[in-house]
């Protein structure tokens, strides 16, 4: 069988994932405003795809052509364009459908041509007092370097100022980072109507207010556009430059190459050609004629308006009642390991533990690594307070966290100014593990408390991402977490681990060993099986090992949210592999590895997907669940996920996103069922 038939291209698999998001926008069982928000999620995901996946593909094509090689990537580029175009057409149809449905619910997203006289007067006042100060037209002339000053993925209005035969072209940035994208208008009769207007359309309506008195014109026309840049920064540098200086420098220079140009499809041809030329759009780039509005990612924040049933019914965060039995978090964790599962559990327990550590006289030291933290991070505040209280605080800051580089540079400087010892990863070795280690003097001993997680220390994402936190004082684990921090500080010194899987040290070898053990058990007639929950499965070495397991009779069950290169149910190769994906109100983000081990199941929670970069080129940590209670909880949750009959889709060779048929099984929406399961665990004794 040819190699191309054994693996799905990861870029196409990623687009199929985003099409599952679009399915949620189309799903009429979802509340109306949530469907509109899924359109925003789809758009945001697609922007990231072009910044990262498409940009990487473009670089591969250019390198291949420079070397005179026949590039498969060129053919893949055509497949991508075709798939995106089809999905975008579905997107446009869904958006129009949802607008009609919103109107039936008395919510009206109107444009500048639909304003009443009262609303027109109100908008001019709004523009004058709240918006005008953020608007500065940029006139395009022969010397204008659009690539230099256009912001990545910002929407602009390209304006035609027509005077006789003469046309001038200014650009207006839509300042949605300073003014709300959705503006509520004064209601008209009947009062129950809730009219809103997009910021884009306010600018369209107020073009006269912007240009009158500065230009003579016969007509003003405005068309929307945006440009997406390659997200990889060029860090070619002198050897003595620090990583923070490099990242700061690269972020100040908006010179990453464009990879996508999106424009309003009725934009005049002359304007399109002028903008393409100014943006140096090449034949490798994506050129997308789109609708009137771009940056639908703002629709993620579509406001709660109208009836309560237009949004999801709230699921209050659950407290882990074990903490309520003790005077502080340390006593609770020392008594037994604690497993938290977000967003079902509240993230407050982790925040409170770090707050307590910041002033507890018994705490000697805190070490933590941050990858993406919230804008107003209480974790950062706790580390600063701990330093002020003379604790020895070490914060490992990952400066190369894509899209969070600027924020992490800010935090690194703020922490350093507060006296925190800040260290960075070695260039080319990102730290993606989710760890902290608290050292506490208890009698004559120093007891260590560790956190190992699957998600970031981020108050905001803990509300929408499913992730685990394991809190433990078990010395078998805490001693090895201590070694991980030593490895981070000295990445080229030898280090060994007995319990943790640590990339790039031992993860690949141990994962291969555990898969091979399942193969051996199956061949001996013993119980065998592999169950994985991942965001992405694209490492060919691991995919091939799973194929080998399937061929040997090992049942393999996979729950993959995003990219999956593995093709299930290939005769003689993957007959025993089943792959599903779940997209619902929460983003499935945790990673779980389960190996049957002849009935004595090994269960790991991990920060690492099965991608080459996570296994070989990042610092990642997977921890075994040593407490039988916690192991069983994860097994129960995994069983619920695989029993989903509402939001589960099959991953198949055709990338069809077929829903798993319910048949005669009971209706199970796994995320709601998991909430009920966690709630049952947290009942008072």
Swiss-Prot record:
Gene3D superfamilies xref list: Endonuclease Chain A (3.30.870.10), Polyphosphate kinase middle domain (3.30.1840.10), Polyphosphate kinase N-terminal domain (1.20.58.310)
Binding site for ATP: 45, 465, 561, 589
EC number, UniProt record: 2.7.4.1
Catalytic EC class: transferase
InterPro entries the record matches: PLipase_D/transphosphatidylase, PP_kinase, PP_kinase_C_1, PP_kinase_middle, PP_kinase_middle_dom_sf, PPK_C_dom2, PPK_N_dom, PPK_N_dom_sf
Residue numbers binding Mg(2+): 372, 402
Family membership: Belongs to the polyphosphate kinase 1 (PPK1) family.
Keywords: ATP-binding, Kinase, Magnesium, Metal-binding, Nucleotide-binding, Phosphoprotein, Repeat, Transferase
Pfam families: PP_kinase (PF02503), PP_kinase_C (PF13090), PP_kinase_C_1 (PF17941), PP_kinase_N (PF13089)
Catalytic site: 432
Span of domain PLD phosphodiesterase: 427-461, 584-614
Top-rank taxon: Bacteria
Task of the protein: Catalyzes the reversible transfer of the terminal phosphate of ATP to form a long-chain polyphosphate (polyP).
GO molecular function list: ATP binding; metal ion binding; polyphosphate kinase activity
A biological process from GO: polyphosphate biosynthetic process
Reaction equation(s) it catalyzes: [phosphate](n) + ATP = [phosphate](n+1) + ADP
NCBIfam families, per database record: poly_P_kin, PRK05443.1-1
GO cellular component term of the entry, any: polyphosphate kinase complex
Processing after translation: An intermediate of this reaction is the autophosphorylated ppk in which a phosphate is covalently linked to a histidine residue through a N-P bond.
Organism: Klebsiella pneumoniae
Protein name, UniProt field: Polyphosphate kinase
Gene expressing this chain: ppk
Cofactor entry: Mg(2+)
